[in-house]
Swiss-Prot record:
<keyword id="KW-0602">Photosynthesis</keyword>
<comment type="subunit">
    <text>The 4 large subunits of the cytochrome b6-f complex are cytochrome b6, subunit IV (17 kDa polypeptide, PetD), cytochrome f and the Rieske protein, while the 4 small subunits are PetG, PetL, PetM and PetN. The complex functions as a dimer.</text>
</comment>
<protein>
    <recommendedName>
        <fullName>Cytochrome b6-f complex subunit 8</fullName>
    </recommendedName>
</protein>
<feature type="transmembrane region" description="Helical">
    <location>
        <begin position="2"/>
        <end position="22"/>
    </location>
</feature>
<dbReference type="GO" id="GO:0015979">
    <property type="term" value="P:photosynthesis"/>
</dbReference>
<comment type="function">
    <text>Component of the cytochrome b6-f complex, which mediates electron transfer between photosystem II (PSII) and photosystem I (PSI), cyclic electron flow around PSI, and state transitions.</text>
</comment>
<dbReference type="GO" id="GO:0045158">
    <property type="term" value="F:electron transporter, transferring electrons within cytochrome b6/f complex of photosystem II activity"/>
</dbReference>
<keyword id="KW-0934">Plastid</keyword>
<keyword id="KW-0249">Electron transport</keyword>
<keyword id="KW-1133">Transmembrane helix</keyword>
<comment type="similarity">
    <text>Belongs to the PetN family.</text>
</comment>
<dbReference type="InterPro" id="IPR036143">
    <property type="entry name" value="Cytochr_b6-f_cplx_su8_sf"/>
</dbReference>
<dbReference type="GO" id="GO:0009512">
    <property type="term" value="C:cytochrome b6f complex"/>
</dbReference>
<keyword id="KW-0813">Transport</keyword>
<keyword id="KW-0793">Thylakoid</keyword>
<keyword id="KW-0812">Transmembrane</keyword>
<dbReference type="GO" id="GO:0017004">
    <property type="term" value="P:cytochrome complex assembly"/>
</dbReference>
Length: 33
């Protein structure tokens, strides 16, 4: 259970960081980090 939860949070954090990079490179101006 704990290992599954750890992998789930790791996958969510990884996909979130990828989304941040994609949105940052889009340059639409709605989100600037």
């Amino acid at each position: 259970m704990l290992i599954t939860l750890g992998w789930a949070s790791l996958a969510a954090l990884f996909s979130f960081s990828i989304a941040m990079v994609v949105w940052g490179r889009n340059g639409d101006g709605s989100m600037n980090f």
